[in-house]
């Protein structure tokens, strides 16, 4: 028997209320902050991610699903959402729009990663990107928007981790300091970090291996290497977060796993026991648009995994509102009533009344049991005698009361009751 591929999952009917709830609140918060939805293809030119994410990153070197199509083009299933949005921004001339251009997405993401709780090889992200503004007040707004999104979902006990990793002017000196420091402790590093020492130095700070975390504790701090402009930007960001009452913790070891980040980086973590350590994060990527062939353009974004959000909602006992479902069951008895019930079902649905119905001849008792199991509040019963009299029985399934209603008044009566 076939099963879903490793690292993927089916989203079954019982989980759909969570997904609908999260997507609904994502669209709501996006509208509040002036973001417009943009959907990009599920696969892109592989070079887009090699160039933007970085050849030395784990994503490019280990995790991308890349294939060659029949035309010989090398394509990659989307491993992250920012680069495709930036590609679309350039391709469709959005740089002529009023800045900042605010775009959001709800997309499937694909990474060949080790499956674990809240982490899948196919997962889904809500992300938003603000392109064309460098002021730190926009950084604060993006962080606030992410924070308020979780609040809308009922996730309130959160921690905001904040750092600045500088720009292309000051970061090289910081990376040199990291290389010198880690070079003195190379023998204590895991094999991955020994590779990162030359290829992706900042990621040394992010390793979760205990031996590497011990080395990272005394590593140079990015804050000590910021140029005057980056330091002023970082201080301005902290001031803006303070005036909107967003508490933050400065984490000078915080980096992000993609090469395009600059200046602001941040992560949001739930504080509850057993929760995923990070449910969302983002940062500024002022060089990415230029790197993809555009003019120098500042930008900042955020992304959060929907599977991780739902995992945390369940752990906190947060139940989403149920999805709408029919509250009326249509039962019938007899061949003539069978055809009449098909026509009646069509009329009820045209009138906006959702119904369940039976499709094969069963006893009325069996049909009403089915109505109960489906949770219907009302049953419309149509038999041969009712049909001759031009009426139907409307039964209250919760209170066991019923009334005979003329068919030409049935729709109005049901609408009154539901």
From Swiss-Prot:
Coiled-coil intervals, chain numbering: none
Gene3D superfamilies: Anticodon-binding domain (3.40.50.800), Bira Bifunctional Protein, Domain 2 (3.30.930.10)
Pfam families for the chain: HGTP_anticodon, tRNA-synt_His
GO cellular component: a single term: cytoplasm
Keyword Repeat: no
EC number of the protein: 6.1.1.21
Protein's name according to its UniProt entry: Histidine--tRNA ligase
């Amino acid at each position: 028997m076939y099963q879903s591929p490793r690292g993927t999952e089916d989203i079954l009917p019982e989980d759909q209320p969570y997904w609908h709830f999260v997507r609904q609140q994502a669209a709501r918060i996006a509208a509040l902050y002036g973001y417009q939805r943009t959907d990009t293809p599920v696969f892109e030119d592989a070079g887009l991610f090699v160039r933007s994410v970085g050849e030395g990153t784990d994503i490019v070197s280990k995790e991308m699903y890349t294939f060659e199509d029949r035309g010989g083009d090398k394509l990659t299933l989307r491993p992250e959402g920012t680069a495709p949005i930036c590609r679309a921004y350039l391709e469709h001339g959005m740089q002529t729009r009023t800045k900042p251009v605010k775009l959001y997405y709800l997309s499937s993401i694909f990474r060949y990663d080790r499956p674990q709780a809240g982490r899948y090889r196919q997962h889904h992200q809500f992300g938003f990107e603000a392109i064309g503004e460098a002021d730190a007040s926009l950084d604060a707004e993006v962080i606030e928007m992410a924070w308020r999104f979780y609040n809308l979902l009922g996730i309130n006990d959160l921690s905001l981790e904040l750092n600045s990793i500088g720009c292309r002017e000051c970061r090289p000196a910081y990376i040199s300091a990291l290389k010198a420091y880690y070079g003195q402790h190379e023998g204590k590093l895991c094999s991955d970090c020994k590779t990162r020492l030359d290829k992706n130095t900042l990621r040394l700070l992010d390793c979760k291996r205990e031996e590497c975390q011990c080395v990272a504790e005394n590593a140079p701090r990015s804050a000590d290497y910021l140029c005057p402009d980056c330091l002023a930007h970082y201080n301005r960001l902290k001031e803006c977060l303070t005036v909107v009452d967003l508490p933050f913790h400065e984490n000078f070891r915080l980096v992000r796993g993609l090469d395009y980040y600059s200046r602001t980086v941040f992560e949001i973590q739930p504080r509850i026991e057993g929760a995923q350590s990070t449910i969302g994060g983002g940062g500024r990527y002022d060089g990415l648009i230029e790197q993809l062939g555009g003019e120098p353009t500042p930008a900042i974004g955020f992304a959060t995994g929907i599977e991780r959000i739902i995992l945390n909602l369940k752990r906190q006992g947060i139940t989403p509102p149920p999805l709408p479902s029919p509250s009326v069951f249509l039962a019938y008895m007899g061949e003539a009533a069978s055809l009449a019930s098909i026509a009646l079902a069509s009329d009820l649905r045209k009138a906006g009344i959702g119904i369940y119905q039976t499709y094969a001849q069963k006893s009325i008792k069996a049909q009403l049991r089915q109505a109960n199991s489906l949770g219907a509040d009302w049953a419309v019963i149509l038999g041969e005698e009712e049909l001759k009299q031009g009426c139907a029985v409307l039964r209250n399934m919760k209170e066991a009361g019923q009334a005979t209603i003329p068919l030409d008044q049935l729709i109005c009566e049901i609408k009154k009751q539901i």
